[in-house]
Amino acid sequence: MIVGIGSDLIDIRRVEKALERHGERFTHRVFTEVERVKSDRRRMRAASYAKRFAAKEACAKALGTGLAQGVFWRDMGVVNLPGGKPTMHLTGGAAERLNALIPAGHRPLIHLTITDDFPLAQAFVIIEAVSVE
């Protein structure tokens, strides 16, 4: 059963300006170490960061909190499964909120799709409660 849906659209140029203006102060405040390492290796660095930013916003919306109620930027990180498919790894307040959404006898499954087509980056998140039986 679907317990949360979120989407976000961001202008890559906005992230590009934040990177130019604030550099590591911005990246260390918003992104996990895994995300920073991956994005910093990309040729289209700003687009990579923008997709991850959009994914965090979409995830926060799917959790039903936005970036409030104990959910912080670095509590949500984009990670890739062994086959390369992106998903979200949640910690801290985001993980607590996720667990509160999931009914007994179920486990959470987070679906993520991210894309970019300059000047836009977009993400969709669906949180599903899957029966453990």
Curated annotation (Swiss-Prot):
Residues bound to Mg(2+): 8, 57
UniProt cofactor(s): Mg(2+)
Any single Gene Ontology cellular-component annotation: cytoplasm
Family: Belongs to the P-Pant transferase superfamily. AcpS family.
Species the sequence originates in: Chelativorans sp. (strain BNC1)
The UniProt record lists the keyword Cell cycle: no
GO molecular function, one term: magnesium ion binding
General function of this protein: Transfers the 4'-phosphopantetheine moiety from coenzyme A to a Ser of acyl-carrier-protein.
Protein name from the UniProt record: Holo-[acyl-carrier-protein] synthase
Enzyme Commission number(s) from the entry: 2.7.8.7
Keyword Nucleotide-binding recorded: no
Compartments where located: Cytoplasm
Keyword tags: Cytoplasm, Fatty acid biosynthesis, Fatty acid metabolism, Lipid biosynthesis, Lipid metabolism, Magnesium, Metal-binding, Transferase
SUPFAM superfamilies in the record: 4'-phosphopantetheinyl transferase
Annotated catalysed reactions: apo-[ACP] + CoA = holo-[ACP] + adenosine 3',5'-bisphosphate + H(+)
BP GO annotations: fatty acid biosynthetic process
Entry-linked HAMAP family: AcpS
